């Protein structure tokens, strides 16, 4: 999709951007991932007799996604710029939570019925590598199902105003350290992938540390 968009717009003399946060004057750009599981033409997420229509399988899937969220966060937010999107009040999540039809939560359950019930992962930005994002979603969900995990009660109301919630990683440095130590990531994605991805992102972090930004020039050129 990204390559196609760039090719089409190049013909019109334009360049699209998939940065998670292009401007500090605007909200960021998301890359939310909607997920549902089906067997023999029927959703295994749906149970008409259960609260919110969520089957036991879906509850375990959500629980796994929640547990995996901080450990796999770097796969959803792979760039230094990614973390500028997670700002309170911007419709981007800031805490590790799940909820029913709540756009301030990281994981949003949408349950209109048996054909539409799904989990919306609201963490990924527009800069996500969709293949890695899908893999991370499936890894967390599968871990939850295989381990028969159960989620905590869903968060309600404005998550931005809630207290005592587990924060999401604030920087790529934090996210990479969590990924590097994650047994879940290594079990489901493999040591070779994790080691390569971590090394690649640490190289990116070092490049960023050495860069002198326009903000620094405006801030300090005359003042210091």
Task: Identify what each model region corresponds to.
Residues 1-155, 159-165:
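Active-site capping/gating regions of soluble enzymes
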Residues 156-224:
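Acidic, glycine-enriched catalytic cores built around paired aspartates
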